Amino acid sequence: MTDLNSESFSALNFWKSVEKKNISTNFQGTKVVAPSKKINSFPLLAPPAPPPPPTEQEINIGSGNSTFISSNNNNSNNNNNNNSNNNNNNNLNNSNNNNNNLNSNNNNNNNNNNNNNNGNNNNNSNFLTRQDSSTQKEWDEQNVTEAFGFWKQKAVQLQKETERYNARRNARQTIDLTNILRKSTSSDLLIKPPVESPPLTPVGQDDEGEQQQQQQQQKQSSPSTPSNDTDTETTAAAVTTTTTTTTTTTTSTTTTTTETVLQANQLEIKYGGETIAVVDDSGTTPRDYRRSRSISCEIIPKINGVITTSPQRVTTTTTTTTPSTGGVVVADEESDSSEEESDSSEEESDEYTDEESETELQVVSNATPRRSDDFTPTIVESPPLTSVNSNDNTSSGTVVAPIDLNSSTGGNTGSQQPPQPSSQQQKPDQASENTAVAASSISATTNVTSAASTTTVAPDSIINTKDVTVVSSTLTTTTSATSSTTSATTQSIPAPPSPSQQRAAQSISTSSVTPAAITKPTKDAKDKKDPAKKSIGATLTRTVTKTFIRDSKENNKVPTGTSPPVSSSTSISSSTGIKKDKVKLSKEEKDRIKKEKSAKKKKEKDEKKQQKTNKKALTKNNSSTDVKKGFVSPQQQQILDSPYRIYGVRLTQLVLSNDGDLPAILTQTITVLSNSNKLDVNSVFVGAENEPAVREIRKRSDLERIDFSIIGDPRVVAGLLILFFAELPQPLFNSKFFGDLVEINDITNPQVKLNDLKQLINSLSQLRRSLLQILVTFFTSKYINGNSVTTRAIAIQSIAQSFGPQFFRGTSSSDSDIQVGIETLKLIIDNYVFLFEKTNEPDVKYKNIDGKMIISEGSIDKLIDKATDQYYPYNEKYFSLTFFITHLFFIQPHELADKLITLYRENLDTLETKKKWKKHRRSKKASFINEAVKLWVDYCYKEMREDKELSKKILKGFPHLEAQLASRLSHRTTINDFLKLPKRVHSRTRSASFSDTLLSTGGIGSTSGGIGGGVNNCLLSAMEIAEQCTLVDYDLFTNVRLSDWVRLVQGSVDPQTAPSLSLALKRSTIWAQWAMGEILSTEDKSQRVAIINLLVDVAINCKDLANFNTAISIHTALTNHHIKRLQQTWDSVPKETLNKITQLEQSLQVWLKPDATNPFGVICQSINSACVPNFSILRTILSQIDQKIPTFSNDGSMVNVEKLRTIFGIVVEIQRLQQQRNYTMKPTKLFIQLQDINTVSMDELADLSLKCEPPVSKAKKYNAPADIVDEDWRLKITKTFNKPLATTSVGIDLPRLASSFTFNTTGHKTTPEEKSAYGNKIQDIFHVLVSLAQIESSELETDVREKFTTYIPMSTDPDSDFKRELLKFLDEVCHADNSKLVRVLKCCNQAIIAPVIIEITLNIAKGVPFMDAGGWRILISNINNSNNSVILDKIDEINEDSSNVEKEKLSSSQEQQEQQEQKQQEQQQQQQEPQPLFIRHYKKQRSRSAQSKDFFEFEWFIQLNLDADCKNILSFDLKISNLVFSTDTSPNIRDQLLESFKSYLVSQECVQYINFNENKQPVAAPVTPATTIVTTKEESTTVTSSTTTVVQESVPSTNAE
C-alpha cells in the first residue's frame, strides 16, 4: 500500500487516495430496508420424504449426558405438556370469557401441576434449558422449509381410508396416526412430544399435616440443599416474560370424578371398559386419539388406577406491560407484520436486536383455600430463573430481561440487582411486604386491554392470611377498569398424596427466592449448542411420530366440564361441589350474549387497529432504545423529533437521510483531523470523549445542526467521533458477528486467523465494510506510517484502545469483550493490505447485491469451498442448498463426494489431546463440511440410496457420521412408505375402452345426464373420471424428486436415474392417445359424438381441478388430424360442446401459448392450489430456460452461479406446487384401471380414423397443369444474397471454404506469421475475417483481431461444431447484415453457386453427364479480372510490328510526361471514389466415366460485381476458363461440348488436349481448323492456322492476374 507522508498528510490527499482505491463513499444505489425484529426463516424449500425414525444410538450420538437426559425426560415432558396446552388454548379462552366463573375451580389443580413440574426440574433446569434451546435452535436452523407440514397433510389425506381399521385398532389398544398429525402453531409441539402430567395434589389436608409432610419430603429428596422452616411460608412474585396481552389458558389433567356432559363433537374410545376422552382439535373437547398401527406406540398409561380424563380449562391472571410511549401495547399480531419484509435487510435489522427486547411481565396470583367455603386469598410466587422453561414462549421469540421490581413506573428496566443466593431467605413478613410492593408496581402498569383473573397455586404452601389479603387487594384495586377479575374455588375429592405431589411441594419450598434474584440470561448460555446435533432428516422423522394438537377452528366451542354462563347462584353451588342442572337460556338471553360477544370482538379489533397505528407512529421517528423506555419526557420527545439528531441513530438511517452519502460527522471530522498537524495519538484520542467541550457539543447536536469543520481543537473532534461510534444502536461491526470474533481471537495459527477474519469482514454490508476500510486507511496513513512523534506500536495501541471497543461491541461490557475489540482492531491495522487490498481471487467473481458481496462466477473448487464456508452464509443464506441441489449441471455426484472427502481431510485436526489442539487450533472448516454433507444427504438421499457405490463412498469418507447418515442411505422402510396408499392387486392387462364397456350398454354419464340411453344406468360421470385422472397424475407429480427436476431443466431424463419423471413425461402422450383411441375405437357415429361430449366434460372438470396435464392432453387429442378429419362426426357434435371446446382453449392459453419473456413465472402465478402441470409443456419451457442461460463462462473455466440460482428458484416453485393442499377425493376401481392404461400407436390410430370415415373421392374436372416458368439463375442468386445472415449457410460453408479464399484488394496485408499458420481451419477462418475487415475499416479489423478468440478459441477442435459461436461473433462483433464483411460472406457459400450448376446441367450442357472434380476457389478483388481478353491481349502484343516500337521510341518526352500525369490523376480519383468489389467462384467439373474415350474436364467461374457498399449485385458473368479433352475423346462428346460452351468460352485458346499414355505426358494432337494453336518463345512467335506441333496449356487466371 502506498502511504502518504504523515507530515504532509491532508484531507484532499486522503480522499483522493480513497477514490483511487475504489472505496465506496456513496450508497444511494444500495437497498437499505428499515430494520425489523428478527423473524424466523420463511419456508423456502422442503426436503424430500423423511427417513425412518432414528435408532437409540443415533439419538444419543455425540452426547456425553445422554443418560442424564433420559433420566430427566419425564420432568421435561411434563413442563412441555403444560406449555403446549397453554399455547393451544389462547383463542378458546378469549371466546369463552363468560365461562370463567365455572372454570376457575380448576386453577388450583393446574397451578399445582405446574409447581410440581417446576420443583421436579429444579436441580437440572439449567441443563434442560440449554438442551431445549439447543434443540429449538437446531430446528430453526435446519428446518428452513417446515417440510413436516407436507407429511402431516399426507397422513390427513388417508384419514377416511383407515376408518374400516378403527375397530381393529381399538381392540389392539393403539392410536391412529391420522388423528395425531394435525396442524399446530406451537413450535414446542414440534420439538418434544407431550406426555401425561402427574396428578395434582388433593385439597382438604390439614395445614399442620401439610407442613410436616413438606418438611419430611424436603429432607428425603434433597438432603444436600439447605433450607429453613420459613421456606414453606415464603412467597414471592412470579415474574415471567410474554409477548401477548390476551388472557392465557392452561390445560392440565385431573383425577376428579365430576360428571360432565360431553358436547356433540366429542369422541370416545374404549380402553378396558373405561372411557378415554382426549383433547380434540380445539384443545378442549375429547377426540379420537388413536395411532396408526404402522408405527409402534405404547398404550396410554393409567394414572393412579384412573384413566386420564378430559383436560380442564384454567384461566390465569396475565398482566402485561409493554415498553412504549403513551402506554401503547404492541401485540403479537402487529409485531409479526415485520416478517413480510425482505430477508436482505437481516443484517441491518440486527441493530435493534438488543434494544427491542420488550419487557413484559406476567403476574400469576395463586392461592389455595383451606376449605371450599373460605375466602380465596392471592399469593404471588417467585420461582428462580433456573426453573423457568426456556421454551415457554419459543414461538413468540421472547427474552427474559432484568426487571427492577422496586421501580414505581414499572417500565424502566435499566437497573439491575445482583442475584441473591437461595440460602439467604427473607422472613415471612419481609417477603410479604416485598410481594405487595411488587404486585402493586406491576398492577400499576397494567394495560387497558389486559384481563386479570385470580388463580391458585400449590395447596401445600403455608399462607400468611394478613399479608396475602394485602397483596390480593392491591392487585384487585390497581387493575384497570376494562379488566375482568374472577375467583373461584377448586372442586376435587381428597386423595392421598402421591410422590409427584411430594416432589412438587419440596420444589416450591426450596425454589422460593426474592424478586431481586431474577437476572437476564446471557447470550452465551442461550446460544450454546447441544453436542447431540441432529440433522433435519432425523428431526423430521421424529416430528412425524409425535403428537400434534390441532388449533381451535371454532372460537365458540365449550371446553370439557364447562357449561354456558349461569347466574351467581349456580356458580356458588358448583363451587361447593353440589351438582346443579343446567339452566336453559331463553332466545332473548342467547341473542343478548351473542350481541355482547360481537360488540366485544369489534371493540378488540378496533383497539388492535389503533395499537398498530400508534406503533407505526412511534417507530417512524424513534429508535428501539426510546421505545423501550416506556416513558418519554417532553424534553426527550423534543430530541426524538429533532431533524438534526445524529447521535444514537442508525448508520443506515443517517446515510439515507444524506442521499446515500456518508453523514457529515464522519466526513467533516476526518477532514479536520487530516488537516491537523497534531500527530501525538495519545493527546488526540485517548480519553477525548470525556472532555466537557465534547459533552456540550454532543448535547447541542440533538437540537441544532453542528458544523464540525469549524471546530479547531482536534481532540474535541476526535472525542465527538469516538462518541458517535459509541452511541450507535448497532456497532460498526455487527454485534451478531461478535461471537465469531471471539472464536477468531482464540485461534493461534496466524494464517488461519487472518483468512477467517477476511471472510468475516467480507460478510459485512457494503456500507460497513467501506466505512471500516476508510477509517483504517485514515488511521494508518495519518498516525501510524511515518509518524515522527509516536512510534508505530504505541500509535496502534492507542487507536485500538480508543476505537476498538466502539467498533466491536458484544452483548455485555465485560473486560474480556473490550479486550477482544482492541485486539481485533490491532490485527486489522497490522494486516490492512491483506484484509482489504488483496481481494482479487482468480477463480471467483463477485457482484454487489443490496450491499452484500454475492458470487456471480466461480470455479468448481471455489464453489465447494464457499458451500462449506463458515461465514459466506451471512451474505447468501441458501447458497449451500442451491449448490447441492443444482450440482448436476457441472459435476457428477461421485466427483463431488471425492472433493468433499479431500477437503475434509485437509481441514481435519488430527491432534488428539486438548492441550495440543488448543495450541495449534485451526478453523472450524471440518465441522461445516460435516454439516454440508448432512444437508446434501437430507435433500438427495433418495438418489443416493439407488446408487450404492456413492452411499458407501460417503459413509467411508465420513465414518464419524455413519450413525446419522446410515438410516438415510440404507434401504430400510421409511415413513413415506407407510403414508403411501397401498396398491391393490389386480389382474387387468389392458385398459377398457369406453366403447367396449360402456357405450354398448348405454352406461356413459355426464354432469348433465346420461347419453345414448344411459340416463338411468349412469355408471361413470365426467366428474368421477376427472377426479380419478387427477389422482393418477397427482401421484406421479408428487413422487418426482428434486434432482429429477434439475435433470429436466438440463434436458437429460434417463428412465433409470429418474423413473418417476420419465413416467410423468409419458403420461401426457398416454392421455392424448387414450382419448383418440376411445373416439376411434367405435364405428358408430352417435357413439363417437357421445364420447366426444364426455371427453370435453372430463377436460373441463380436470381444468377446474387444476389438472392441466389431462385437460391439455384431451384438448390435444381433439385437435389432432386423425380426429379433426372426421367431418361427419363433427357435424353431429352439438353446438354447446363446440362452445365448451372454445372456452376450454381460452382458459388454457397460459399453457398453450406461454409468455415469451417469463413463461414459467406466469404459470406459477396463475396457480394457487394443488395442481398437476402439463409435463410436456413444462419440459419445453424449462429446456428453453436452460438454453438461454449458459452454464459456464465464456472461457469455460468458471460456473455461472446466476444460472444455479435461477434453477434453484424453479425447483422451489415446482416443489411449492407439489406441497399444495392434497386432493380429498377417494380412489376407486377406476383409479387402478387408469394407472395401467394401454394406448394405441399413432399408425393404428391413423388406420382407425380411415376406417371410421373412409376418404370420399370426388370426381373433379381435369385441369392441365400450367406451364411452370423456370426462374432465371441470376434472380435466384439475388434472392439468396438478400436473405438474413441467420437463414444462410455461411456458418456451415465458411469453415470448409476458408482455405480457398484469395484476396487481391488494395490495402490487403498478410504477415509471414499468418501465412505460416495456413492449413489450420480456425486460423484460416480468422485470416479470412481479418482480410474482409480490412476492406471495410481499420476499427473493424482491430475488433476482429481482439475479440475472435473470446468466441472461438484457437485451441478449438477443428472438427467440432462451432456454427453458433461463429454466427454469434458475426452478429455481435461484425454487426451482422449491416456490415460489408457479412454481405461479402453471403456471396461466398454453396447457395450462390447452386443455381449456376443447375443452369449448366439442365440448359447449357444438356445431355452430357458430368460430375464435380473438386477444387473450389474464391477470388475477392476490387479490380475487374475478366479473362475475356487475357490471351488475346498477349497475342496482340506478340504480333506487334517493330515499327510500333520505334514510334514509341521516337515519341517526345513531353507526351510521356502528360500520359503519366493523366494516369496518376485517374488512380487518385479511383482511390478517392468507392471502388466496386468483384467476387469470383472457380469450380471444376469432369466426365463421369474414367475411360479416355469419354474423358473431358472443364473449369467455369461465376463473377459477381458488387457496388461500393456491397448492398446490391450490379452484374453477373458466367464463363468457361478451361476445357480439356483427351486425344481419344469421342467426336460426339467433344463437338457437343464445344457447341454448348461456344458462347461461354473465355477464348478459343483455352481448349486443350491431353494424351493419356503410360507417362501421361501431353503430346501433339490434331485439331479442327477453327482452333488456334499458340506457341510462345523468346525469340519469335509463329501463328499457324492449319497445323499445330505443340499444345500449350492455358495460363491460369490467377497467374495472369
From Swiss-Prot:
Changes seen on gene knockout:
Leads to considerable chemotaxis defects, including poorer directionality, more directional changes, and slower speed. Exhibits impaired crown formation and particularly retraction, resulting in more crowns (macropinocytic cups) per cell and longer crown lifetimes. Leads to defects in macropinocytosis, phagocytosis and cytokinesis. Leads to increased level of F-actin as well as to flatter and more polarized cells during vegetative growth.
Low complexity biased stretches: 70-126, 211-256, 310-330, 435-458, 475-493, 500-520, 558-577, 1465-1474
Q: Which residues form a coiled coil?
A: none
GO MF, one term, reads:
small GTPase binding
Q: Where is the composition biased (Acidic residues)?
A: 331-359
Q: Where in the cell is it found?
A: Cytoplasm, Cell cortex; Cytoplasm, Cytoskeleton; Cell projection, Filopodium; Cell projection, Lamellipodium
Q: Tell me which Pfam families the record gives.
A: GlfB_C (PF24929), RasGEF (PF00617), RasGEF_N (PF00618), RhoGAP (PF00620)
Residue span(s) of domain Rho-GAP: 649-836
Quaternary structure and interacting proteins, as annotated: Interacts with gpaB and rapA. Interacts directly with F-actin.
What functional role does this protein have? GpaB-activated, rapA-specific guanine nucleotide exchange factor, involved in the regulation of the balance between Ras and Rap signaling at the leading edge of chemotaxing cells. Spatially localized activation of Rap and Ras induces F-actin polymerization at the leading edge of chemotaxing cells through the Rac, PI3K, and TORC2 pathways. Also acts as a key regulator of actin-driven membrane protrusions during processes such as phagocytosis and cytokinesis, possibly by modulating rapA signaling pathways.
Give the protein name, as stated in the record.
Ras guanine nucleotide exchange factor glfB
Q: Which organism is it from?
A: Dictyostelium discoideum (Social amoeba)
